[in-house]
């Protein structure tokens, strides 16, 4: 099967109608973090002064005072027109796995390190955010992964991932054995420290550190990156996003394993289990300030060289 480079299915980015308006906005952030709390307080004050109804995720609401409605992520997804996540990419990933099912627009204020998914600066967000709230923004859909663990043909655990699903041993630096199938066609057996199955969104995260290629967000593709394979010939491979990836763990593995979703959610895996990873029907709807440039983000975050002439 060839890789589908038709970026129009589904559409990766579109300009939103200038008449789009937001009314109820949810605030989400990293709990017990001084910088995040300061930004959340500024956001809450600024948004309420603009006349918006503001809800705060319950883990951060207690640090914002008493005059704010505290709700969980599910209620933010159900009631809000926009969610603002303050923190790093990890905070965005945690919120996105819940909010993607609501098709809620999400924008980030960077209080982390690299901040590939968080566009707004924490100390000067007002001007850019005001334009977004006036309808001047771009939207971009990022697909998620669905990871399932089967034991003796029965589904034992499942979850979703925005960046990657990783099969790995319970112990650090311990080799495991497994087979990999693409759409039920045997690809190879592996003796490695694990396998990273990444979306284009995750290709600048763990997969990049493991030697994988960067995939632009509009590609409908997945990248499989073996972790320290016990062979010189095994390299990352890119497959169509419609592919179903199956990994069968050897019964001879002498310990328990895990599938980690974005490094946050861990699914228990036993020797002999099968792991199925496929594209989820859920998509993250990212909101960017108008004119957002992905390659500018790469240059800035990864320290690439600027134009020579």
From Swiss-Prot:
EC number(s) given by UniProt: 2.7.1.23
Entry's Gene Ontology cellular component terms: cytoplasm
SUPFAM superfamilies for this protein: NAD kinase/diacylglycerol kinase-like
Record: active site: 89
GO biological-process terms attached to the record: NAD metabolic process; NADP biosynthetic process
Reaction equations catalysed: NAD(+) + ATP = ADP + NADP(+) + H(+)
Cystine crosslinks: none
Localisation: Cytoplasm
Superkingdom classification of source: Bacteria
InterPro entries, sorted: ATP-NAD_kinase_N, ATP-NAD_kinase_PpnK-typ_C, NAD/diacylglycerol_kinase_sf, NADK
A Pfam family of this chain: NAD_kinase
Enzyme class per UniProt: transferase
Residues the entry annotates as binding NAD(+): 89-90, 163-164, 174, 191, 193, 204-209
Keywords: ATP-binding, Cytoplasm, Kinase, NAD, NADP, Nucleotide-binding, Transferase
Cofactor requirements of the protein: a divalent metal cation
GO MF entries: ATP binding; metal ion binding; NAD binding; NAD+ kinase activity
Role noted for this protein: Involved in the regulation of the intracellular balance of NAD and NADP, and is a key enzyme in the biosynthesis of NADP. Catalyzes specifically the phosphorylation on 2'-hydroxyl of the adenosine moiety of NAD to yield NADP.
Family designation: Belongs to the NAD kinase family.
Name of the protein described by the UniProt record: NAD kinase
Organism, as annotated: Shewanella sp. (strain W3-18-1)
């Amino acid at each position: 099967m060839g890789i589908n480079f038709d970026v129009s299915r589904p559409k990766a980015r579109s300009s939103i109608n200038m008449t789009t308006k937001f009314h109820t906005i949810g605030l989400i952030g990293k709990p017990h973090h001084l910088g995040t709390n300061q930004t959340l307080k500024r956001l809450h004050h600024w948004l309420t002064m603009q006349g918006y109804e503001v809800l705060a995720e319950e883990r951060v609401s207690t640090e914002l005072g008493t005059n704010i409605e505290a709700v969980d992520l599910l209620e933010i997804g159900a009631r809000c027109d926009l969610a603002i996540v303050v923190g790093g990419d990890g905070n965005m990933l945690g919120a996105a796995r819940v909010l993607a099912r609501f098709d809620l627009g999400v924008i980030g204020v960077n209080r982390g390190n690299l901040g590939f998914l968080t566009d707004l600066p924490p100390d000067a967000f007002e001007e850019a955010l005001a334009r977004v709230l006036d309808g001047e923004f771009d939207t971009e859909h990022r697909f998620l992964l669905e990871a399932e663990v089967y034991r003796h043909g029965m589904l034992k655990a499942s979850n979703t991932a925005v960046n990657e699903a990783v099969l790995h041993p319970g112990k650090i630096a311990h080799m495991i054995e497994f087979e990999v199938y693409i759409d039920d066609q045997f690809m190879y057996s592996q003796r490695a420290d694990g396998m990273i199955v990444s979306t284009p969104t995750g290709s600048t995260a763990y997969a990049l550190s493991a030697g994988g290629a960067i995939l632009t967000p509009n590609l409908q593709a997945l990248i499989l990156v073996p972790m320290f394979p016990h062979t010189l010939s095994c390299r990352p491979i890119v497959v169509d996003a419609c592919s179903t990836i199956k990994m069968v763990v050897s019964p001879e593995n002498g310990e328990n394993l895990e599938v980690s979703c974005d490094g946050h959610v861990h699914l228990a895996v036993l020797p002999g289990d099968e792991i199925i990873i496929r594209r989820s029907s859920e998509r993250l709807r990212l909101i960017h300030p108008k004119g957002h440039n992905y390659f500018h983000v790469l240059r800035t975050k990864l320290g690439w060289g600027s134009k020579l002439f």
